């Protein structure tokens, strides 16, 4: 069972995958997207889903700190429907509050340069989202 973890932004989509046992999450890549133009990187995502035999997707669901759903959360809900219809696999919306900030802090503490952080932050956030979900199962 392989589970895909995604962190949706307006310009990038962070991608992570679980190991076959569903214990650990590893970052795969950051896909460039254009949310405003309707390009969500589905062609590349289709290759990844096929390559890993994905049977579930965990999508980061950004809520406001008070638990309400704002514009980014609504965008994630819409994208979840697209994913379900495109790949015919269940999509779990996972509370991702502060995941990008936590990923940034981890990269800063590892002394990763600002330029390198920009390239991997969304992939790291996807790892944290997926790992949080996997930990909740085990």
UniProtKB/Swiss-Prot annotation:
Keyword annotations for this protein? Cytoplasm, Hydrolase, Nuclease, Ribosome biogenesis
- Coiled-coil regions, chain positions: none
Q: Which cysteines are joined by disulfide bonds?
A: none
Q: Where is the protein situated, by its record's location annotation?
A: Cytoplasm
Tell me the SUPFAM superfamilies matching this sequence. Ribonuclease H-like
Q: What is its EC number?
A: 3.1.-.-
- EC class: hydrolase
Q: What is its main location?
A: cytoplasm
Quote the SMART domains the UniProt record gives: YqgFc
**What molecular functions are annotated in GO for this chain?**
nuclease activity
Q: Which GO terms describe its cellular component?
A: cytosol
**What GO biological process terms does the UniProt entry carry, in alphabetical order?**
rRNA 5'-end processing
Q: HAMAP family recorded for this chain? A: Nuclease_YqgF
The task this protein performs is described as: Could be a nuclease involved in processing of the 5'-end of pre-16S rRNA.
Question: NCBIfam families of this UniProt entry?
Answer: RNAse_H_YqgF (TIGR00250)
UniProt family annotation: Belongs to the YqgF nuclease family.
Name of the molecule in the record: Putative pre-16S rRNA nuclease
